[in-house]
């Protein structure tokens, strides 16, 4: 089991926290597997003017962990590129 720390835009993170968004479309470059864990770092969509690169804001939010429940990959006949996967995720309860 691995722990993956992923970047996520604020608008998607809010939906994940509310349980409205229970999946993630990701580039399949980390060998995701069922049972792996995910945490998220929220990124700003618009970096501050003084920065050229993507800016990661440190939010004082609870450290929340999600478990990968399902990995959908290798189905180009349904329009999912071979380099991407869809992760079914569920928040771990404390």
Annotate the PLM regions:
Residues 1-94:
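Catalytic phosphate/metal-binding cores of nucleic-acid and nucleotide-processing enzymes, i.e., regions
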């Amino acid at each position: 089991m691995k722990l993956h720390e992923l970047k996520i835009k604020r608008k998607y993170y809010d939906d994940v926290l509310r349980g409205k968004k229970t999946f993630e479309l990701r580039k399949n470059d980390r060998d995701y597997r069922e049972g792996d864990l995910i945490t998220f770092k929220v990124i700003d969509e618009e970096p501050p003017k003084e920065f050229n690169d993507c800016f990661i804001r440190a939010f004082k939010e609870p450290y929340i962990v999600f478990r990968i429940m399902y990995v959908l990959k290798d189905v180009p006949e349904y329009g999912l590129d071979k380099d991407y996967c869809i992760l079914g995720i569920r928040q771990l309860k404390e």
